[in-house]
Every structure is written in structure tokens, then in C-alpha cells.
Amino acid sequence: MYWLKKNIGRVEITELSASARLEGLRAEQEHFLGPSFGPISAYGEHGAIVHYSADEKSNVPLKEGKLFMTDTGGHYLEGSTDITRTVALGEVGNIEKEHFTLVARAMLRLANTVFLYGCSGANLDCIAREVFWKEGLNFNHGTGHGVGYLLNIHEGPINFRWKEGERPAPALEENMVITDEPGIYIEGSHGIRLENELLVRKTVKNEYGPVSYTHLRA
């Protein structure tokens, strides 16, 4: 991100060249084994396409005044990652700032949740999503998914979704890794998503029976 903000407006940068540069920096990291999925590099209105994939036909230059979203990940000896960041290139409008604040609030609310053992992702999803619902907004994807080590980066059966699927979601267990990735997508304008990986950790037992309070750790 430092490289991007330092060079935007000074040299030509496109969605594809930005993605290549960021992937190249990752490849220089110790114990890097390879990308964990195809990167998403989305500028401006392309950010509103949840699974946008830049190619030679859709590729556009990055300029100041809009948002840029990058969703990338890598496989390492120590684990696999899936991380999304959205950054402002120069000054952006008030609506983009307001939407970014909503997404950040939602992501942090879920990341700091403490819950009783036995809860599934379906019990917790609304903790993040309520921030949007109060503003008449929503996003049409899960708030998080399980992460596979050197396998599928989207790995079940755990997830954060407000609606139960055909099979009941299992309880979150200690040491499970799950993503936290709320977003806002405004067609023709912008998209914002922030994504971290969370580790499920036990905390304390109390008088409410043979269960432990559990919390998520970013």
C-alpha cells in the first residue's frame, strides 16, 4: 500500500500492474509457497463487482479520486492467508468515507466478539451486519468463511452467514481460523471490503454451566 500511494499519479499504474507488483512483493517474503487464489484488483466501480477479475479487456489505469480494492492471499509454511484492503487514492467523496467507516465498524465489531461455546457463525453474523441494516444497507455474500491450510482458501463447514443453509452450521471450536470480511457495493460507483483472518480462542469458564466463553482473535 505504501508503494501504491507513493507512486499513484507519478507513474502509470493499472489494475493489472498493481496486482503484479503486490504479488511480487509477497513472493519475496520468507517461506512463501505460492498464491492461495487468483487476486482481485479492482479500481473505482469495478470494486462493486464482488468477484471481479481484471483482464486485458477490463483493465483500467488507477488515478487519484477513487477507491482501490485488493483481495489477495498466499500459502506459507506457517499458514494460508486471505486478506482484503480498500484504500483511497487521493481525496475521495464523503459517501465513500461514510461507507468505509461502516465497513470498518462492522469488521471490528465481529473481530472483538465474545460468545458462549456452542455458537455457530450463523449466531454471530448479525453482529457485523447490524451496522449496515440500521442504514438500510446489506451485502450479498457471507461475512466470513473457514480457511484451509495449503488447500481451498474457502473451506467449510464453518462460516459467518445470517441465514442457515441446508445443513446446520457446526459450532466454532478453538483454533479454527475464519475470515471477517463485510463490505458495501454500490453499482457504478465503488466497492469497499475489509478482510482479516480470525482465530477462535477460549477464554474463561463461569457459572453458566460446562461451557466456556470464547473470543475471536485477529
Give the ranges of each region predicted by the language model.
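Acidic/polar loop patches that form or flank catalytic/metal-binding clefts of enzymes
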Residues: 33-34, 111-125, 137-143, 179-180, ...
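Short, basic/aromatic beta-hairpin or loop at an interaction surface
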Residues: 35-48, 143-159
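Composition- and surface-driven signal marking solvent-exposed, interaction-prone regions
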Residues: 55, 81-86, 145, 190-197, ...
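Conserved small/polar residues in nucleotide/adenosyl-binding loops
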Residues: 214-218
